[in-house]
Amino acid sequence: MSHSPLSSSIADLRKSYERAELSEDASHADPLLQFDQWLREAIAAQVPEPNAMTVATVGSDLRPSTRVVLIKGYDAQGIVWYTNYDSRKGRQIAGNPYAALQFHWVELERVVRIEGVVEKVSEAESDAYFHSRPLDSRIGAWASPQSQVIPSRGMLVANAAKYGAQFLLKPPRPPHWGGFRLRPDQWEFWQGRKSRLHDRLRYRLEDGTWERERLAP
């Protein structure tokens, strides 16, 4: 069965964004508080995986790459997630610590973009989070050589069985696994609006103070 190209029908896919607005008067002066409010609203609205975010990094070859991870914490110090340090993103961050994050809550017609410098969290933080994970996930951190080419899924299954037997119920945190923290120096909050006249508020860190400004859509 042949299929016709979707290019023409894709070009016609569009919707009008009319759920909400974002004004300077109604937004927080501190972008972290604005993010906290929007994340809470996404959770309350039962948005699927509201904690999922895209992480964009750039390698030494200047080629950007993205992937979706789950945020595991946020405070005045930054945004935290956990991963394999030997993964592609881990290697890219080691060579270039600048990265960008994006949350897209489709149901609320909202996007949050965050830029800044990434650093590793402390060993104690990584240990605490690792040991809070389900056992299968802790074994998986040992079993998967993330981002490396493998011969088959069977290798992962065999590795999981091997490390499960080796560590029983108490696997330690792998030395190649831990947390990253992005320290923001720029935030952008995007709220879809009618006629493509969307609201965009950007916060830039200037001499320790957040400067808020409106961007054209």
Swiss-Prot record:
Superkingdom per UniProt: Bacteria
**Cofactor annotation comment:** Binds 1 FMN per subunit.
Which Enzyme Commission numbers does its entry carry?
1.4.3.5
Q: Which GO terms describe its biological process?
A: pyridoxine biosynthetic process
The protein's annotated catalytic reaction(s) are: pyridoxamine 5'-phosphate + O2 + H2O = pyridoxal 5'-phosphate + H2O2 + NH4(+); pyridoxine 5'-phosphate + O2 = pyridoxal 5'-phosphate + H2O2
Q: Which residues bind substrate?
A: 14-17, 72, 129, 133, 137, 196-198
Recall the GO molecular function terms of this protein's record: FMN binding; pyridoxamine phosphate oxidase activity
Give, as in the UniProt entry, the pathway in which the protein acts.
Cofactor metabolism; pyridoxal 5'-phosphate salvage; pyridoxal 5'-phosphate from pyridoxamine 5'-phosphate: step 1/1; Cofactor metabolism; pyridoxal 5'-phosphate salvage; pyridoxal 5'-phosphate from pyridoxine 5'-phosphate: step 1/1
What NCBIfam families does this protein's entry cite? pdxH (TIGR00558), PRK05679.1 (NF004231)
The subunit structure is: Homodimer.
Name the record gives this protein: Pyridoxine/pyridoxamine 5'-phosphate oxidase
Q: Which organism is it from?
A: Acidovorax sp. (strain JS42)
Q: Which gene encodes it?
A: pdxH
